[in-house]
Design a protein with these regions (language model features):
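Active-site/substrate-binding loop(s) of hydrolase catalytic cores
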Residues: 37-38, 53-60, 67-189, 202, ...
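Bacterial N-terminal signal peptides
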Residues: 11-22
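N-terminal cap/lid segment of alpha/beta-hydrolase-fold proteins
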Residues: 27-39
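Active-site-adjacent mobile loop/cap segments within catalytic or ligand-binding domains
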Residues: 166, 190-248
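A short loop-to-beta-strand scaffold at the N-terminal edge of the catalytic core in hydrolase folds
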Residues: 39-47
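Bacterial N-terminal signal peptides that target proteins for export
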Residues: 2-13
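Active-site beta-strand termini and strand-to-loop segments that position acidic
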Residues: 47-51, 205
């Protein structure tokens, strides 16, 4: 195991302990188990704000277990109030087994970000895409959640490139987030078959899903900035004065 995986695993275990301890009641969020991993760890959704809010934002802290810095953003989001006029949905990780082990894939070795039902194809190696689309309990849990909740904006945190992946379609939301977090907006050129965000943008073209690639080394200042960027973006998009003229 590499040093990065060891460190990711140790940090991830600490975050998982916080999340599984039922701490939501102490921070004003509702906690719901939306599924279980291969190794039967709970996949946890925290919600805050009003279900009748004008904007619904989903934040996923980690889908790759060795890219867990986004979970620090989600933890910080959970310690504060939801942005005004926003229902905030937070899933710290859909891959708790990978986070605990410090591995990209789940306990079956499947890259969950190659397991969604959009342009899926069989892949091997480190991007093993599973036996079929949605073959994994973790990706099925995320898929069910998104179909049920239909978020207006979804932010998927990754590492380590230090950029915002410019999504297909209207890039306004991702561009604004790029400005707020001070990371460049770049179109990643790979095909990325079976990716979660591309499935969302294809299936729900009126909403926006985009990837935030945090750098490999993330300090507390960037975590604070990332948290503030999520809150500011949601506040801007939910503002009646702004939202009427802003494409998502």
């Amino acid at each position: 195991m590499t040093r990065r995986k060891r460190l990711s695993g140790f940090a991830g275990l600490a975050l998982l302990a916080f999340l599984f301890a039922g701490s939501a009641s102490a921070i004003g969020a509702n906690r719901q188990v939306i599924g279980h991993s291969v190794q039967d760890r709970p996949i946890v959704l925290f919600t805050s704000g009003s279900p009748e809010a004008s904007l619904k934002v989903l934040v996923v802290g980690a889908i790759h277990g060795d890219e867990a810095a986004g979970m620090r953003v989600t933890r910080r989001l959970l310690t504060g109030p939801a942005p005004r006029r926003t229902e905030l949905l937070v899933v710290p990780t859909i891959n708790p087994d990978g986070v605990a082990a410090g591995t990209r894939g789940n306990a079956h070795g499947v890259d969950l970000n190659r397991n969604f039902p959009f342009r899926w194809r069989p892949l091997g190696g480190g991007e093993y895409s599973g036996a079929s689309p949605l073959s994994e309990p973790e990706s099925r849990a995320a898929h069910r959640l998104i179909l049920r909740e239909r978020p207006d904006v979804t932010i998927w945190f990754h590492q380590p490139f230090g950029l915002i992946d410019r999504p297909q379609g209207n890039p306004f939301t991702a561009r604004r987030f790029s400005d707020l977090i001070d990371l460049p907006l770049v179109r990643l050129r790979g095909p990325y078959p079976g990716s979660a965000s591309r499935w969302q943008n294809h299936h729900f073209p009126q909403s926006t899903a985009f990837v935030v690639e945090l750098p490999e080394h993330v300090n507390r200042s960037l975590i604070k900035q990332g948290t503030a960027a999520v809150q500011a973006l949601a506040s801007e998009l939910a503002s009646p004065a702004l939202a009427a003229g802003l494409p998502r």
